[in-house]
Amino acid sequence: MAEIKILTEKIDKRELKRLVEQCFKDMVKYVVDIRQKRIAIGGELHADAEQLLLESGSEQKDIWGANYYPGKGESGCIEYTALINIRPSSGNSSMEVIDNNLQEKIREITFELIGKGEGL
């Protein structure tokens, strides 16, 4: 099983590169806890990272999945899409995070803990 790490501070660039290369080569899946402002990054499935956050104290309503693409700059590095985001009861009926305010929270935490789309 591919490694998943919980981030509470900025990830080292070498570590990010290793996580990107372990599964998809050009991107890494991650899950953000918007309340605790932490990220579970790595692995093959968003659901695995989601489970890790849930087991360590996160609440389902605060967890959203995304993909990070290094080297695509601030405007292109985040894809707000994951199966775990399908939550009709929370007003999100698609894989993509629809709410702009929620996207902004994810973006802020991503820029703080992962990066702003810089190359590796």
PLM regions and their residue ranges:
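Eukaryotic low-complexity, non-globular regulatory regions
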Residues: 1-3
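Generic structural "secondary-structure junction" signal
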Residues: 8, 55-56, 65, 80, ...
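Negatively charged, low-complexity tracts enriched in Asp/Glu with abundant Ser/Thr
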Residues: 10-52
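Short histidine-centered catalytic/ligand-binding loop motif
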Residues: 12-20, 89-99
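Amphipathic, interaction-prone secondary-structure segments
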Residues: 44-75
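Intrinsically disordered, low-complexity regulatory segments enriched in Ser/Thr/Pro
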Residues: 70, 74-97
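Well-ordered alpha/beta subsegment
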Residues: 96-120
